[in-house]
Amino acid sequence: ADLGIDFLAAGIGNIHGKYPANWKGLSFETLDAIQQLTGDMPLVLHGGTGIPTDMIKKAIDLGVSKINVNTECQLSFAEATRKYIEEGKDQQGKGYDPRKLLAPGFDAIKATVKEKMEIFGSVGKA
């Protein structure tokens, strides 16, 4: 269908942020219906953080081509930075230098993105 858009991000049970313990999962029935109506239009899954890998892979099989996992990146950054400070590394030498203080968080985001690229099957693709 020609909707005049390049990507479609529809709600199929996904949310931004952390998922509650009683989350019911993605609605693949809804995703399939959307894919049937939109044809080859690339679909986006917002709120990818915390969605089980098997659901992510099924969503990809049903046409999702972009998955947002910003919350997961932020959480990994915060955890690594917190650990750096809790270990007192910011008090050693010039550990307070923002380049040193923020480096563990940067590395954590990079590791998270690499892991997600593997899961999403996007390694080696432009």
Locations of regions flagged by a protein language model:
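Alpha/beta enzyme core
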Residues: 1-39, 53-58, 62-64, 82, ...
